[in-house]
């Protein structure tokens, strides 16, 4: 992989603060499930486990006679880690009070030494009135246990799965008391730009002039696409393979790749949900939440972009700007759920979906499709054909567009335990797509996890050109190692969704993979893509999503700080720089140079 991937700016944790006893003494540390602990004289503990199941790991308990840890005097809980494994591994730090928990994750390369930190959501700082949106808090004065483990396990069982030295657990940095708001003064909490009203941060927008000034400033900072790329974002100086005029896949030197229409190797580095807007909650609900209550469904990003570009019909100008942004960030693919107006510009490779929601297909009682019903395949084919023939739609153009890599059909489906339904589903999807877009790749149905039965992997591998998986973990490097549910197939895999978030810029939730701060978001981005690049199956890594979710939540309540840009279209610089570094180096890295 080379040393460059380890040359990451260390993320600071702030000064050490006095705290409750957090020493790793043998009388207060217990192994969980299959974990094994070795206590060292220097005060550290080596944690080893061959399994990620059942919270396998290390648990630190309060001292005898105490009900919990008092972590109220620090902004972060931090610990030093050293990887003793021969593979990239992931570790999570978790804290729990009497009823709730939170965690932060990190990936470690072999031999790497670093610090993991968890942003403590103090209830005495982040409390919000009942019924109003806010941070999920913990009683940090009485934390019942601290644990090091692997959350959302997908890994197969193998010796040395987890092998890490843990030391110097500590509190760092003072709590952010300035964030505290008296409950009586909390409402309203959303400012006219969709930001958290009561917080202060470097990139906060305060006037319309701030938005107008952003455009010229950022345009002056944008860079061209990496020099190593061809016109598709493929490896211009790599091997020349057969050019077919459309994207395809090929295994080269033991690793799967996409191949561009001109015959160059291509690793898909993408971002999902690239749009002008975001999910728009109903503005007429909870009007007391807003400084400027909207009358209907509101989209603060849309309103902010109108001010930024000085007109209501800004979309064309904005998407030209976005495409320049993606080049500058080292992103070569427009991911799923993005605006068709953007993909139809034909300037960057993209992936689209045929949506099955609302399609009249026979179903089982559990919600999955009755793929054994005699009408299923024909109905599915008809729905795909109808969608592909809608005049002016992104799908209609994409079926013959060289920039279109392929199509997903379905998303995070709940497959039944009966494997008899698997192959008929994938077969019907493959044949339906082949009937309308024979030159396009069938990209699967975006599994909701890397953990699936061997029967499901096998059925997908038989019919999918690429198997897509949404997996919110810090590393995918050991996905095919071990014996438990290890997929036995040889087919390219797309990591179709992942992200890292933190409590920053006033946001209330860090998403499905919380980390300590923006520096950690960037670091984890580089680590997870590096692990995928080393793996022979992965052909792409797609971040979810382009923009932070609404502060008050989308329709299902998600309000994650997970974007490359915030609600005011201001980028997160550390994450953008990390993506650029990956985009510049990924071809040499995947080729083992």
Residue ranges of model-derived segments:
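Extracellular ligand-binding interfaces
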Residues: 50-134, 142, 159-165
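Short carbohydrate-recognition loop motifs
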Residues: 35-59
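Substrate-binding cleft of secreted/luminal carbohydrate-active enzymes
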Residues: 405-406, 498, 513-564
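Active-site groove signature of glycoside hydrolases
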Residues: 387-420, 435, 443, 538-545
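Short beta-strand-plus-loop segments that form exposed binding edges in beta-rich domains
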Residues: 149-157
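Aromatic-rich peripheral "rim/lid" segments of glycoside hydrolase catalytic domains that contact
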Residues: 544-593
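Active-site-adjacent substrate/metal-binding segments within catalytic domains
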Residues: 200-345, 359-403, 428, 544
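Extracellular glycoside hydrolase catalytic/binding regions
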Residues: 285, 289-296, 421-527
């Amino acid at each position: 992989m080379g040393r460059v991937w380890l040359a990451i700016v260390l993320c600071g944790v702030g000064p050490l603060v006095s705290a409750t006893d957090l020493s790793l003494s043998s009388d207060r540390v217990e192994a969980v499930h299959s974990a094994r602990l070795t206590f060292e004289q220097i005060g550290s503990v080596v944690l080893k486990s061959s399994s990620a199941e059942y919270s396998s790991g290390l648990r630190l308990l309060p001292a005898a006679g105490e009900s919990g840890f008092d972590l109220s005097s620090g902004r972060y809980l931090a610990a030093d880690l050293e990887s003793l494994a021969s593979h990239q591994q992931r570790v999570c730090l978790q804290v729990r009070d009497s009823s709730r928990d939170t965690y932060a994750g990190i990936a470690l390369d072999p031999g790497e030494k670093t610090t993991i930190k968890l942003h403590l959501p103090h209830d005495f700082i982040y409390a919000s009135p009942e019924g109003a949106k806010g941070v999920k808090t913990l009683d940090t004065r009485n934390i019942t246990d601290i644990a090091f483990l692997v959350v959302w396990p997908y890994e197969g069982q193998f010796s040395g799965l987890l092998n890490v030295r843990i030391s110097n657990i500590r509190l760092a940095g003072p709590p952010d008391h300035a964030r505290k708001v008296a409950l009586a003064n909390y409402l309203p909490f959303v400012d006219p730009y969709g930001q958290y009203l009561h917080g202060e941060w470097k990139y906060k927008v305060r006037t319309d002039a701030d938005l107008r000034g952003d455009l010229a400033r950022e345009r002056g900072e944008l860079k061209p696409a990496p020099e190593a790329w061809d016109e598709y974002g493929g490896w211009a100086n790599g091997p020349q393979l057969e050019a077919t005029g459309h994207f395809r896949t090929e295994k080269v030197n033991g690793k799967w790749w996409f191949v561009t229409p001109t015959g160059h190797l291509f690793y898909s580095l993408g971002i999902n949900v690239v749009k002008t807007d975001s999910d728009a909650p109903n503005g007429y609900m909870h009007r007391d939440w807003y400084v400027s209550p909207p009358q209907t469904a509101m989209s603060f990003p849309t309103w902010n972009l109108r001010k930024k570009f000085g007109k209501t019909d800004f979309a064309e100008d904005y998407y030209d700007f976005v495409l320049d942004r993606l080049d500058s960030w080292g992103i070569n693919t427009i991911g799923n759920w993005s605006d068709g107006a953007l993909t139809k510009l034909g300037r960057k490779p993209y992936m689209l979906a045929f949506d099955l929601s609302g399609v009249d297909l026979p179903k089982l009682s559990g919600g999955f499709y009755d793929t054994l019903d005699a009408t299923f395949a024909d109905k599915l084919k008809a729905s795909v054909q109808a969608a592909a023939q809608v005049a002016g739609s992104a799908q209609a153009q994409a079926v013959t567009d060289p920039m279109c890599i392929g199509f997903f059909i379905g998303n995070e489906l709940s497959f039944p335990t009966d494997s008899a339904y698997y192959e008929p589903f994938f077969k019907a999807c493959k044949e339906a797509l082949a009937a309308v877009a024979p030159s396009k790749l069938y990209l699967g149905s975006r599994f909701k996890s890397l953990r699936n039965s061997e029967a499901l992997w096998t059925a997908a591998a038989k019919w999918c050109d690429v198997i897509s998986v949404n997996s919110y973990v810090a590393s995918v490097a050991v996905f095919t190692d071990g014996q438990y549910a290890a997929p036995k197939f040889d087919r390219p895999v797309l990591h179709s969704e992942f992200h890292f978030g933190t409590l920053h810029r006033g946001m209330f939730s860090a998403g499905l993979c919380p980390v300590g701060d923006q520096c950690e978001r960037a670091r984890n981005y580089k680590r997870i893509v590096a692990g995928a690049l080393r793996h022979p199956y992965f052909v792409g890594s797609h971040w979810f999503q382009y923009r932070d979710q609404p502060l008050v939540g989308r329709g299902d309540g998600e309000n994650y700080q997970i974007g490359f840009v915030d609600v005011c279209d201001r980028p997160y610089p550390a994450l953008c720089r990390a993506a650029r570094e990956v985009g510049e180096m990924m071809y040499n890295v995947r080729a083992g140079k």
